[in-house]
Structure formats: C-alpha cells, structure tokens
C-alpha cells in the first residue's frame, strides 16, 4: 500500500508517483473509497469521506454472551447511519458512524464514548462492562448514496460504498476488472 501523490496520463499510459516510488500502467482501477486523495481530483469530488468506528468490550461470561445473542449472529439496525454489532471471542464488537470525520486520535476517543452509549441503549446489561479496544477507518458516501462505477479520463473506478464495501468491493472489483479487459464500462 502506498499513497498516490501524482497521477498523469500521457498518450496511452498512466504515470503514477507514489510515496514508495513511480509506477507506469496502461490502465488503472481506482478503488480508494474514503481515502481518495488530491491526486485524483475528479474522483475526490464524487465522494465524502466519513469515519466508521468500532469498540470491543472486555470478554463477557458465556451466560451474558448467550443472553445478548443466543445464535451469535451479526446484527445491524435500520437507522440511516446504522450501527452493527456481533459477538466475537465473547466480546461485544459494536460499530457505527459515531463521527462524520475521518479517523484521528480525537475522533477515535470521542467515537468510543458515543458508541458505548449506543451499545448500552441496545444492551443495558453492558453498562458496567469495560471497553478494551477502539479503532476506526474511513469510508465514503456518494452524494446520491449510490455506489458509482465507471470511467473518467481513461481511469476506471468503483467508489461510494457507504459502509457496504466489504461485500460490494470484492464483487465490483472483479466485475470492473473483467470490463476493463473487454474495454466496455461506462457509468
């Protein structure tokens, strides 16, 4: 992984400068999601980077874990900016959009507090449970809340997963790569 600092297209080749060195390619697929940077301004304007954060509790007793999720299933609510949660290793893993800013030291700490409140709203029996871990990442939302796949200036892209990238990015990555090989993709 290396951040792209400059991107140019000359004739039929792309010249890409990264923090780790230069790359040349005949075609490229941009799948940067919330990390789409200044080097690709036309795509950066298509999405809004938003933080997504997760907390993990201390290990819970078998009895409490069963009480919270008898079938140990992944759960999410139906809010527009949803929360999602499940048990793993007898820990409650609880995530959501606690802050609309990309992750940094301040947003991670504040997000842990917000997610803890949300977790206790859903599971009041966790009010005295300690939070062992918190982390975050940056995802992207398109202005129309839809995933966008297409080609701009000869670059193929897939962006705007709105928190569904784990499932959709794998599928669309394969689909776009196949379309690139055939040369037939339009937004």
Q: Which residues does each predicted region cover?
A:
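Conserved ATP-binding module of the ATP-grasp superfamily
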Residues: 1
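Active-site substrate-recognition segment that forms the wall
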Residues: 4, 14, 21-62, 66-153
């Amino acid at each position: 992984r290396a951040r792209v600092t400059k991107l140019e297209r000359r004739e039929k080749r792309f010249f890409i400068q990264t923090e780790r060195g230069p790359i040349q390619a005949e075609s490229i697929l941009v799948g940067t999601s919330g990390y789409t940077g200044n080097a690709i301004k036309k795509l950066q304007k298509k999405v809004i980077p938003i933080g997504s954060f997760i907390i993990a509790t201390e290990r819970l007793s078998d009895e409490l874990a069963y009480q919270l999720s008898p079938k140990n299933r992944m759960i999410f609510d139906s809010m527009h900016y949803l929360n999602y949660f499940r048990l793993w290793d007898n820990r409650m893993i609880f995530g959501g959009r606690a802050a609309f800013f990309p992750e940094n030291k301040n947003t991670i700490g504040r997000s842990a507090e917000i997610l803890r409140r949300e977790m206790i709203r859903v599971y009041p029996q966790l009010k005295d449970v300690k939070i062992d871990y918190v982390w975050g990442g940056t995802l992207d939302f398109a202005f129309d809340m839809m995933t966008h796949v297409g080609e701009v200036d000869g670059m193929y892209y897939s962006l705007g997963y709105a928190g569904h990238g784990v499932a959709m990015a794998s599928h669309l990555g394969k689909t776009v790569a196949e379309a690139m090989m055939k040369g037939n993709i339009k937004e």
